[in-house]
Amino acid sequence: MLRQYTTGSYGPHEEGPGIAEIRTHLPDDEASSRMALLASGFADPGRIRLLSALAGGAVCVGDLALALSVSQSSVSHQLRLLRSVGIVSSERRGRHIYYSLAWPGAAKVLGDLQGAIEGSERWQDPAMAGDNIQEEE
């Protein structure tokens, strides 16, 4: 039985074969939640820069802080978040902990994001993208 939201034959807002086709492309609720959690790791300009720094290989917190011109505590906080969502991993080497990308797809996501902003005028001006991006001081 078809549930109709408006009158007519399979028009807008009516359950029909087109809706079933759309649903085949939808992830289930659990997958959607996991995908959103993973995407949250990329949802901060500072984390994007941090992940970009790690794309070159394992780096310790102190070196990341110096390279990014931010405090070690800020870097550590962001790394904990990224580790909790599974994007980065850590390894102790003597007195230092080195971080690296745990998910190989992270470098591809960063590259795709970079390609998207370089290939579209929409993303050249943050105001055009509907977002106010501010640099951390």
Predicted features and spans:
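Amphipathic alpha-helical dimerization/coiled-coil segments
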Residues: M1-R34, W103-E137
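Alpha-helical residues within the helix-turn-helix
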Residues: L66, H77, R83-S84
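N-terminal helix-turn-helix DNA-binding core of bacterial DNA-binding proteins
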Residues: D29-S73, I97-A106
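Beta-hairpin "wing" of winged helix-turn-helix
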Residues: R83-R93, S100
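Functionally engaged cysteine thiol sites
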Residues: C60-G62, V85, E121
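Recognition helix of helix-turn-helix DNA-binding domains
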Residues: S73-R80, R92
